[in-house]
From Swiss-Prot:
Protein name per UniProt: Small ribosomal subunit protein eS1
NADP recorded as keyword: no
InterPro entries named among the record's database cross-references: Ribosomal_eS1 (IPR001593), Ribosomal_eS1_CS (IPR018281), Ribosomal_eS1_euk (IPR027500)
Organism listed in the record: Helianthus annuus (Common sunflower)
Description of how the protein assembles with itself and partners: Component of the small ribosomal subunit. Mature ribosomes consist of a small (40S) and a large (60S) subunit. The 40S subunit contains about 33 different proteins and 1 molecule of RNA (18S). The 60S subunit contains about 49 different proteins and 3 molecules of RNA (25S, 5.8S and 5S).
Gene Ontology, cellular component aspect: cytosolic small ribosomal subunit
Subcellular localization(s) per the UniProt record: Cytoplasm
GO MF: structural constituent of ribosome
Composition bias, Basic residues: 1-18
Protein encoded by which gene: RPS3A
Amino acid sequence: MAVGKNKRISKGKKGGKKKAADPFSKKDWYDIKAPSLFITRNVGKTLVTRTQGTKIASEGLKHRVFEVSLADLQNDEDHSYRKIRLRAEDVQGKNVLTNFWGMDVTTDKLRSLVKKWQSLIEAHVDVKTTDNFTLRMFCIGFTKKRANQVKRTCYAQSSQIKQIRRKMREIMVTQAQTCDLKELVQKFIPESIGREIEKATSSIYPLQNVFIRKVKILKAPKFDIGKLMEVHGDYSEDVGVKLDRPAEEAAPEATEVIGA
């Protein structure tokens, strides 16, 4: 009988099976802080691998983009169709300080606006704010029936659409060029630009549901910690308070010992 390996006899491997390490044991949670122009400042939490050698945790967090519903930021369900993008700019302690990085409208809201018997008018323009942010703003609007109109449809002529589009661009440029990014975001929240476009174009053709549907940041200025702290307003890191020592507990004066 030939001598060989008996396959039926299983031998134990050296060292045994390695225990799988929990990947979360090497990670830390950080709080995401929204700018002070929003009511809710604590957006949520994010994970990052702890600092190991040359890999610094804070560097891995910078420039992360978080998408948050405006309803959560403003504690108002009326804003649930808006999505705000926030980008991580700096890390202080366990807090990630963010800044506005774009805006969008949910798909279901956009689909609900598009209907028959009306004209859809869109315009977009590139603008630069006073603090050197370059943005691309997209506007959308729909025609509506005039007062006492019997006709079922409310289609605008191509010449009227061109005029309305020109007016949309003009208003978006004037509104953005005269303020900084923080002030511009404060105009987006109550949809004041959309209402102004409705008023300005009413003489050409009455409009309804005029929205700044999307905002993209094309170019941002060089990072400045001072500007970021202005955006976050009253934010300050948790530090100890300096206490005054009572007069009777004054530190003893140092005495020099001669010959020591």
